Protein backbone atom coordinates (compact mmCIF):
# COMPACT_ATOMS: atom_id res chain seq x y z
CA UNK A 1 0.00 0.00 0.00
CA UNK A 2 2.63 2.54 1.10
CA UNK A 3 4.95 1.77 -1.81
CA UNK A 4 2.17 2.11 -4.37
CA UNK A 5 1.13 5.47 -2.93
CA UNK A 6 4.73 6.74 -2.74
CA UNK A 7 5.30 5.74 -6.38
CA UNK A 8 2.13 7.56 -7.42
CA UNK A 9 3.20 10.73 -5.59
CA UNK A 10 6.63 10.52 -7.22
CA UNK A 11 5.01 10.27 -10.66
CA UNK A 12 2.65 13.18 -9.86
CA UNK A 13 5.58 15.32 -8.68
CA UNK A 14 7.32 14.63 -11.99
CA UNK A 15 4.26 15.63 -14.01
CA UNK A 16 3.17 18.64 -11.95
CA UNK A 17 5.94 19.83 -9.61
CA UNK A 18 5.00 22.52 -7.09
CA UNK A 19 6.70 25.84 -7.79
CA UNK A 20 9.94 26.44 -5.87
CA UNK A 21 10.06 22.88 -4.45
CA UNK A 22 11.33 19.52 -5.59
CA UNK A 23 11.56 16.08 -4.00
CA UNK A 24 12.59 12.55 -4.85
CA UNK A 25 14.07 9.36 -3.46
CA UNK A 26 17.59 9.13 -2.09
CA UNK A 27 19.17 6.33 -4.13
CA UNK A 28 16.95 3.26 -4.41
CA UNK A 29 15.12 3.74 -1.09
CA UNK A 30 11.61 4.95 -1.93
CA UNK A 31 10.87 5.43 1.78
CA UNK A 32 13.64 8.06 2.13
CA UNK A 33 13.47 11.22 0.02
CA UNK A 34 15.34 14.47 -0.15
CA UNK A 35 13.43 17.66 -0.86
CA UNK A 36 14.57 21.13 -1.85
CA UNK A 37 12.72 24.35 -1.09
CA UNK A 38 13.77 27.66 -2.59
CA UNK A 39 13.42 30.48 -0.06
CA UNK A 40 10.25 32.43 -0.94
CA UNK A 41 11.01 35.77 -2.63
CA UNK A 42 8.77 37.69 -0.21
CA UNK A 43 10.58 36.38 2.88
CA UNK A 44 13.94 36.85 4.61
CA UNK A 45 14.84 33.40 3.22
CA UNK A 46 14.87 34.67 -0.39
CA UNK A 47 17.84 33.37 -2.37
CA UNK A 48 18.35 30.42 -0.04
CA UNK A 49 18.16 26.77 -1.02
CA UNK A 50 16.93 24.61 1.84
CA UNK A 51 17.28 20.85 1.92
CA UNK A 52 14.90 18.59 3.79
CA UNK A 53 14.84 14.91 4.60
CA UNK A 54 11.58 12.98 4.22
CA UNK A 55 11.05 9.54 5.77
CA UNK A 56 7.83 7.72 4.95
CA UNK A 57 6.47 5.32 7.58
CA UNK A 58 5.54 1.81 6.42
CA UNK A 59 1.87 2.66 7.08
CA UNK A 60 1.94 5.81 4.90
CA UNK A 61 -0.44 7.55 4.03
CA UNK A 62 -2.27 6.64 7.24
CA UNK A 63 0.59 8.12 9.26
CA UNK A 64 2.38 11.36 8.32
CA UNK A 65 5.88 11.37 6.84
CA UNK A 66 8.73 12.57 9.05
CA UNK A 67 10.02 15.75 7.46
CA UNK A 68 12.91 17.84 8.70
CA UNK A 69 15.28 20.50 7.50
CA UNK A 70 18.88 19.41 6.97
CA UNK A 71 19.84 23.03 6.17
CA UNK A 72 20.01 25.28 9.24
CA UNK A 73 17.34 27.96 9.36
CA UNK A 74 16.39 30.76 11.77
CA UNK A 75 12.65 30.29 12.24
CA UNK A 76 10.26 30.13 15.23
CA UNK A 77 8.68 26.87 14.02
CA UNK A 78 11.88 25.01 13.04
CA UNK A 79 14.47 24.05 15.65
CA UNK A 80 18.22 23.43 15.44
CA UNK A 81 17.62 19.71 14.75
CA UNK A 82 15.53 20.68 11.73
CA UNK A 83 12.25 19.55 13.33
CA UNK A 84 9.23 21.41 11.97
CA UNK A 85 6.25 22.45 14.05
CA UNK A 86 3.44 22.11 11.51
CA UNK A 87 0.00 20.77 12.40
CA UNK A 88 -0.38 18.66 9.23
CA UNK A 89 2.78 16.74 10.16
CA UNK A 90 1.20 15.87 13.51
CA UNK A 91 -2.44 15.76 14.62
CA UNK A 92 -3.91 17.39 11.48
CA UNK A 93 -2.43 14.82 9.08
CA UNK A 94 -4.85 13.30 6.60
CA UNK A 95 -4.23 10.52 4.05
CA UNK A 96 -5.64 12.96 1.46
CA UNK A 97 -2.51 15.11 1.87
CA UNK A 98 0.51 14.57 -0.38
CA UNK A 99 4.20 15.43 -0.15
CA UNK A 100 3.54 18.18 -2.67
CA UNK A 101 0.96 19.75 -0.30
CA UNK A 102 3.30 19.29 2.66
CA UNK A 103 6.13 21.11 0.84
CA UNK A 104 3.79 23.95 -0.14
CA UNK A 105 2.67 24.24 3.50
CA UNK A 106 6.30 24.45 4.60
CA UNK A 107 6.89 27.17 1.96
CA UNK A 108 4.00 29.19 3.33
CA UNK A 109 5.34 28.67 6.87
CA UNK A 110 8.57 30.34 5.70
CA UNK A 111 6.56 33.32 4.45
CA UNK A 112 4.17 33.41 7.43
CA UNK A 113 5.66 31.94 10.61
CA UNK A 114 3.31 30.92 13.41
CA UNK A 115 4.81 32.50 16.55
CA UNK A 116 1.84 31.32 18.65
CA UNK A 117 2.85 27.65 18.23
CA UNK A 118 6.64 27.96 18.35
CA UNK A 119 9.24 25.25 18.49
CA UNK A 120 11.83 27.90 19.40
CA UNK A 121 10.19 30.34 21.86
CA UNK A 122 13.18 32.75 21.81
CA UNK A 123 12.89 33.25 18.03
CA UNK A 124 9.09 33.58 18.34
CA UNK A 125 9.62 36.31 20.94
CA UNK A 126 11.99 38.22 18.63
CA UNK A 127 9.50 37.77 15.74
CA UNK A 128 6.68 39.24 17.85
CA UNK A 129 8.62 42.07 19.49
CA UNK A 130 11.30 43.13 16.98
CA UNK A 131 10.40 42.05 13.44
CA UNK A 132 13.34 43.84 11.80
CA UNK A 133 15.84 42.06 14.09
CA UNK A 134 14.14 38.73 13.29
CA UNK A 135 14.35 39.40 9.54
CA UNK A 136 17.99 40.46 9.81
CA UNK A 137 18.92 37.25 11.68
CA UNK A 138 16.90 35.09 9.25
CA UNK A 139 18.67 36.75 6.29
CA UNK A 140 22.10 36.26 7.94
CA UNK A 141 21.43 32.56 8.59
CA UNK A 142 20.15 32.14 5.04
CA UNK A 143 23.34 33.73 3.67
CA UNK A 144 25.51 31.63 5.99
CA UNK A 145 23.86 28.21 5.61
CA UNK A 146 21.62 28.19 2.53
CA UNK A 147 23.49 29.98 -0.26
Curated annotation (Swiss-Prot):
Outcome reported for the amino acid change (mutating residue 108 to A): Reduces ubiquitin transfer between ubc4 and pub2. No effect on ubiquitin transfer between ptr3 and ubc4
Effect on the protein upon substituting residue 105 to A: Reduces ubiquitin transfer between ubc4 and pub2. No effect on ubiquitin transfer between ptr3 and ubc4
Domain UBC core: 1-147
A Pfam short name: UQ_con
Subunit structure: Interacts with the E1 ubiquitin-activating enzyme ptr3 and E3 ubiquitin-protein ligase pub2.
Family: Belongs to the ubiquitin-conjugating enzyme family.
Name of this protein: Ubiquitin-conjugating enzyme E2 4
Organism: Schizosaccharomyces pombe (strain 972 / ATCC 24843) (Fission yeast)
Amino acid sequence: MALKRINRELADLGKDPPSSCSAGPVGDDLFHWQATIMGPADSPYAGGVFFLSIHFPTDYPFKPPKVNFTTRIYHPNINSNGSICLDILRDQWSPALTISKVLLSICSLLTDPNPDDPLVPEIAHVYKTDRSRYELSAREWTRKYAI
